[in-house]
């Protein structure tokens, strides 16, 4: 947020200063945090190297093979979390809010690695996180080879080819005829992943410079050497254009009051 405030209010709009922001930066504005000194709709969005959709993994030896199993269970699964601001915590609350599930969240782990270790030890059974680390690093690479965990739900708009049997939350919404307001709440929380790791220029940056920056960024993301290096590091390059990010920022902020109030409650604001 400090970086966003600086780029918005302090940095000169000359095309020489850019900021890489948190993908969830719009949420602070949406729920009305007093520290916010920016309007995400007025940034000049340049581009993002990836989307950051979330997923929920569960130990394969647990009795929970689907979200429906969680709903029917008399004892809810235990999911680890770093705290109430973490992706793991927010995803669990979203599933409870929109799909009438119960998930027991164990708070206080210092970081994701400690949660994963707790899963291995059997202290907890599940964790929510973004897809990039799940597909790109240990222990997940080994876990997937050993079928140690299953992914129960994916937060993207379409299924991920690496987990083709895992439904998206939107498929489940369609199946269960989830009300429109609940879908909007999910969109506000989950579609932040479409921002990925976005670059922005200050408001007031000349349009011709914004175009130069967007074009240069798009060319860089398509550079074969960069794509090859990313593959070596088991990283996905799925660039999002500045124009698409601009539209997304407008959509995320333009929510009806009922949705905003539910998002505030979900985030504990």
Per-segment meaning from a language model:
Residues 14-21, 78-80, 124-134, 151-152:
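Paired acidic/hydrophobic, glycine-rich loop segments that form the ligand-binding mouth/hinge
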Residues 6-17, 25, 29-121, 173-184, ...:
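Hinge/capping helix and adjacent helix->loop/strand transition within the periplasmic-binding protein
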Residues 38-49, 102-108, 139-192, 241, ...:
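Short beta-strand->loop
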Residues 145-151, 174-175, 204-269:
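An extracytoplasmic/periplasmic, membrane-proximal ligand-sensing/linker region
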Residues 23-24, 108-112, 131-134, 155-159:
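Glycine-rich beta-alpha junction loops
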Residues 102, 125, 236:
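Residue-level detector of anion-binding/catalytic polar loops
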Residues 1-13, 93-94, 98, 113-127, ...:
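Short helices/loops that flank or line small-molecule/ion binding pockets
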